[in-house]
Amino acid sequence: MKQKVVSIGDINVANDLPFVLFGGMNVLESRDLAMRICEHYVTVTQKLGIPYVFKASFDKANRSSIHSYRGPGLEEGMKIFQELKQTFGVKIITDVHEASQAQPVADVVDVIQLPAFLARQTDLVEAMAKTGAVINVKKPQFVSPGQMGNIVDKFIEGGNDKVILCDRGANFGYDNLVVDMLGFGVMKKASNNSPVIFDVTHALQCRDPFGAASGGRRAQVSELARAGMAVGIAGLFIEAHPDPDHAKCDGPSALPLDKLEPFLKQMKAIDDLVKSFDELDTSK
């Protein structure tokens, strides 16, 4: 079955092409740390031959606690992104939370991301669509895979069909997430075979029901990522940090930065194997 291709400059994203890595840090903690993390990702992905897009947030507007670190904000964040692009020649993905942010962000980065909690907000979707940028839609934890087609339709009606879908798990009772591996195929079918990627970092979240920040299960990042890659998907979304225990956001789910290369070697081996198989139709 023909898979839709979404192009991010010279990077082609599709379910049957070699996987694209969307990776970096959860939130911009500082200019220097962003440079360090981006350089490491670029070095490793170039060594392994993996197409790469750098990820970071300039504002974490959905933190659980009013006291939690949110980021440097729009103006300073765009300056850091511009420096990263100039220094490393890297593509960049970041999220927007308000309609007014869509165009200023799209003027700097290559992919704008629709956060899971906001994925059904039509005014935001329409503003993002109008930019003409490539869009990454995070599947909300409370939305079934089949319903993602409706969100894609909103973008298409807004004049933008350059849409990538991203799964980050579903609510399983209170304060826990699980990933339904069958959901990747359902999302492909619901969106006319749009590229589907897997956010393994945020799928590892779990939390103290009375706590002010998310916990995580980073010890299981490899096994969960291996399972997702075995399905056959367009890309992997993974955040890393040189000192996860002291990260300003989602450290418990972050991959230790020094584990990035061995981790990606596993992911590439699985992706290469799975995509070497002929398509097998078992529906008849």
UniProtKB/Swiss-Prot annotation:
GO terms for biological process: keto-3-deoxy-D-manno-octulosonic acid biosynthetic process. Keywords: Cytoplasm, Lipopolysaccharide biosynthesis, Transferase. Pathway: Carbohydrate biosynthesis; 3-deoxy-D-manno-octulosonate biosynthesis; 3-deoxy-D-manno-octulosonate from D-ribulose 5-phosphate: step 2/3; Bacterial outer membrane biogenesis; lipopolysaccharide biosynthesis. Gene3D superfamilies: Aldolase class I (3.20.20.70). SUPFAM superfamilies: Aldolase (SSF51569). GO terms for cellular component: cytoplasm. This is 2-dehydro-3-deoxyphosphooctonate aldolase. It comes from Klebsiella pneumoniae subsp. pneumoniae (strain ATCC 700721 / MGH 78578). The gene is kdsA.
